[in-house]
UniProtKB/Swiss-Prot annotation:
Record key words, sorted: ATP-binding, Kinase, Nucleotide-binding, Serine/threonine-protein kinase, Transferase
Full protein name: Putative serine/threonine-protein kinase ZK507.3
Biased composition (Polar residues): 334-343
Start and end residues of each stretch annotated as Disordered: 302-374
SMART domains tied to this protein: S_TKc (SM00220)
Substrates-to-products reaction catalysed: L-seryl-[protein] + ATP = O-phospho-L-seryl-[protein] + ADP + H(+); L-threonyl-[protein] + ATP = O-phospho-L-threonyl-[protein] + ADP + H(+)
Comp. bias (Low complexity): 306-324
Provenance organism: Caenorhabditis elegans
Active site annotation, chain numbering: 158 (proton acceptor)
Annotated EC: 2.7.11.1
Keyword Ribonucleoprotein: no
Domain Protein kinase residue range list: 25-296
Sequence ranges of Basic residues compositional bias: 364-374
């Protein structure tokens, strides 16, 4: 099959056969579609095609002919297999890798299903509908996800609201980071990419946090992120101006603290997660805000729930990421059983990201010299 040809989508009720005969996957409905494949809601079924239980999952596919170098699904599977070995508290913000395999047309992975992305929620809710507590908790959870991702030895490199999703149904108070196709061992969308990315410098842990910071600012006050749609040079200049402005910004003191700290970091700096977390929690305390209130969509679900269908719809990251253009929340009121055999069979091909084994911290490149931050 040539790259110009696209395989048909998986169809509802289609059965995806596994190597192991204990169960197969049945497609329920398509959740999303991208350039290389689809995301579908699936369930486990027996050989006769009957459901084994009432659990639902997300199957992410990629066209089989995707080249070794362009296969984001392969990288994503490697990353997920790596953190699957970690303790539960270290992966609470990551979707679980359930299964993976391939057919004559598709490569696929199955993971826990999630709810809407933060990008979708920004478009769904009016600014006045999102309480300050929810915004701050989103900031803390999304930042903790980055911290945990760095702890297992990876940079995400694609931090944006579309790559964070709330949990599905009763788990909608937890925020998950997804879409690890650009992850590397120790290119971002234009809106949220760090300034180092504009300068074509090697990206480090600091840059994931800077992208998170732009995303957090956009959740709090959309008027500050004013470079959407600009060219890269103009967007870079705007980001430089914003950091200069925030260092004396009294309207949101936590922005001042965070921006000053981030500008002290260089490529190989060990980012102090506790310092950034305290900047948010101290601000919440000064504003007499509690961070134990239910997130607004979780509260809405409980208020509307009739005992059957959850209000948060299932979704998953598109196989080919796209940047949303929806209106931000503008909440400036804040101031007021993995198949191990399959893994082993592909180990020679897939045991590396940037030439280094998964689960380790060292890169193959010697980093004796810090890149210039001028």
């Amino acid at each position: 099959m040539s790259n110009s040809q696209k395989p048909p989508s998986l169809q509802p009720n289609e059965i995806i056969k596994r190597t192991k005969p204990d169960y197969n996957w049945k497609v329920i409905v398509e959740l999303g579609k991208g350039g290389y494949g689809t995301v579908n809601k699936v369930i486990k079924v027996n050989e006769e095609g009957f459901a084994i239980d009432d659990k639902e999952y997300a199957m992410k596919t990629e066209q089989k002919f995707a080249s070794k170098h362009s296969s984001r699904l392969k990288i994503e599977r490697n990353v997920m297999a790596s953190y699957s070995k970690c303790d539960a508290q270290c992966k609470e913000h990551f979707p679980e890798l359930i299964d993976f395999g391939q057919s004559p047309v598709w490569k696929w992975i199955v993971m826990t299903i999630v709810g809407p992305s933060l990008e979708e929620l920004k478009m769904k809710y009016k600014p006045s509908d999102i309480p300050p507590s929810t915004i701050l908790q989103c900031g803390l959870q999304t930042m903790k996800a980055i911290h945990d991702f760095h702890q297992i030895g990876f940079l995400h490199r694609d931090i944006k609201p579309a790559n964070y999703c709330i949990g599905y149904g009763s788990k909608s108070e937890t925020i998950y980071v997804l879409d690890f196709g650009l992850a590397r061992k120790y290119r971002l969308p234009e809106w949220y990419c760090s300034r180092a990315s504009h300068r074509c410098e090697e990206l480090g842990r600091r840059d994931d946090y800077e992208s998170w910071f732009f995303m957090f600012i956009d959740l709090v006050d959309t008027t500050l992120i004013d470079w959407k749609g600009l060219t890269r040079p103009d967007a870079y200049a705007k980001k430089q101006e914003l950091f200069t402005k925030l260092k004396t910004y009294e309207k949101e003191p936590m922005f001042k603290v965070i921006s000053i700290y981030l500008d002290t970091l260089v490529y190989d700096s060990d980012v102090k997660f506790g310092f950034l977390r305290d900047a948010i929690t101290d601000y919440a305390r000064s504003c007499k805000l509690t961070l134990k209130e239910p997130l607004v969509w979780f509260k809405e679900r409980n208020d509307n729930e009739s005992g059957s269908t959850p209000t948060t719809s299932a979704t998953a990251c598109s196989p080919s990421s796209s940047t949303g253009t929806g209106t931000g929340t503008g909440v400036s009121k804040i101031a007021s059983n993995i198949d191990q055999k399959s893994i082993a069979s592909d180990r020679n091909e897939e045991n590396s990201l940037d030439g280094s084994k998964t689960g380790t911290w060292k890169s193959t490149k010697t980093r004796n010299k810090k890149p210039s931050r001028k």
